Swiss-Prot record:
The active site is at S188, H215, D311. It comes from Vibrio parahaemolyticus serotype O3:K6 (strain RIMD 2210633). Keywords: Chemotaxis, Cytoplasm, Hydrolase, Phosphoprotein. One of its GO terms (cellular component) is cytoplasm. This is Protein-glutamate methylesterase/protein-glutamine glutaminase.
Length: 369
């Protein structure tokens, strides 16, 4: 049976374009369209689609409000379309907070080298998030924004970013006894929510630097880092060339670039480079993980989270060869079980963990719990 899709956009041209692309894949079927958020909410209840594609800026009711109402009344996997502007980035992150699973730029030429690649990407994203239809999450409950430009106080409540329903803490974690000097986390589809859930649970005194590699457009990473910084007790920043890695600071790889680590453990710096056109991902998890293995050897605590494809597998292999620790997010809590599956199937990860317990496991491992 085909995956049923509801297409929501106030542009008749875009509704038609998206519908044609979706209907050209035999596994997909557009069952209806909506021209604004209010209509989308009503049709989501009545038609019960498997996936909804949603514009952000629409009359009557905007896409973010529509996502919140749909997730409250009839939770459905939602793929957002957004502009590649700073405001578009902020709105997209709001939509992910509200419960949307993934996003794509509205200008397809910005996400692919040719039309065929763009068509395939849209179709695959819809198919991937449709698999979460029977296991939908609730929207993120965000804490109130800080009233000043300073980072929130350590006593501030962390945002319980959504994922799998919380599991009972039946397993008591034990530290391995290894010593670490760096934490490295790589992710793609579903990563913004996953990273928010993990990072908001880390204390200000987290004992070493954190490098974050999230597949994301260049215009989105600054907005994402800024948002995380307002929500987290640790400092979060978009990485810049020459940054000296400091304990308790998370460095988000800038979109459209590669992030590498240079120097020696304890005095390492970041190099931000273009990386050429040979790499499929910018930023690429393999690139950062590989450089971390060379600089830190067996002193890296690394994680591969939800995401499509296999980026991170080869970098994780290098980390394991150097003696470092690699964990993977488990299938049930992933939006897309691609990157973690690649690591787990290759026998590289030592533990497969549910998202809602990764932060707890990290704190035990580094001696803070």
């Amino acid at each position: 049976m085909a995956i049923k899709v509801l297409v929501v956009d106030d542009s008749s041209f875009f509704r038609r374009r998206v519908s044609e692309i979706i209907n050209s894949e035999s596994r997909l079927e557009v069952i209806d369209v909506a021209v604004n958020g209010r209509e989308a909410v009503e049709k989501a209840k009545a038609l019960k689609p498997d996936v909804i594609t949603m514009d952000i800026e629409m009359p009557v009711m905007d896409g973010i409000t529509a996502v919140r109402e749909i997730m409250a009344a009839s939770p459905t996997p939602i793929l957002m379309f957004s502009s590649l502007t700073h405001d578009g980035a902020k709105a997209t992150l709001d939509a992910l907070d509200a419960g949307a699973l993934d996003f794509l730029p509205k200008k397809f030429e910005d996400i692919a080298r040719n039309r065929d690649e763009a068509v395939s990407l849209l179709q695959q994203r819809v198919i991937q998030i449709a698999s979460k239809r029977a296991f939908m999450r609730r929207p993120v409950a965000r804490p109130a924004a800080a009233t000043s430009s300073a980072r929130p106080l350590a006593s501030r409540t962390a945002a319980p970013a959504a994922s799998a329903p919380a599991r009972p803490a039946t397993t008591k974690f034990r530290a391995s006894g290894k010593k670490y000097q760096l934490t490295a986390i790589g992710t793609s589809t579903g990563g913004p929510v996953a990273l928010q859930k993990i990072l908001t649970r880390l204390p200000m005194n987290y004992p070493h630097p954190i490098v974050l590699i999230q597949h994301m457009p260049a215009t989105f990473t600054a907005a994402f880092a800024s948002r995380l910084n307002t929500l987290c007790k640790i400092q979060v920043k978009e990485a810049q060339d020459g940054d000296v890695l400091q304990a308790g600071v998370a460095y988000l790889a800038p979109g459209g670039k590669q992030m590498m680590i240079d120097g020696r453990a304890g005095a390492a710096r970041l190099r931000i480079i273009d990386g050429g056109d040979r790499m499929n991902y910018k930023p690429c998890v393999d690139v950062t993980f590989g450089s971390a293995a060379k600089v830190y050897g067996d002193k890296v605590l690394s994680m591969v989270l939800t995401g499509m494809g296999a980026d991170g597998r080869e970098g994780a292999r290098m980390l394991k060869s150097a003696g470092s620790t690699i964990w993977a997010q488990d299938e049930e809590s992933c939006v897309v079980y691609g990157m973690p599956q690649a690591v787990a199937k290759a026998g590289i990860s030592s533990e497969d963990l549910p998202l809602d317990r990764i932060a707890e496991r990290m704190l035990v491992e580094v001696g803070l719990a």
